[in-house]
């Protein structure tokens, strides 16, 4: 499922 970044993971950089 896509997150806020639109990726299959949540890159919280």
UniProtKB/Swiss-Prot annotation:
Disulfide bonds: none annotated. InterPro entries: Pyrokinin_CS. The keyword Secreted applies. GO terms for biological process: neuropeptide signaling pathway. GO terms for cellular component: extracellular region. Its main location: secreted. Belongs to the pyrokinin family. This is Locustamyotropin-4. It comes from Locusta migratoria (Migratory locust). The lineage of its organism: Eukaryota, Metazoa, Ecdysozoa, Arthropoda, Hexapoda.
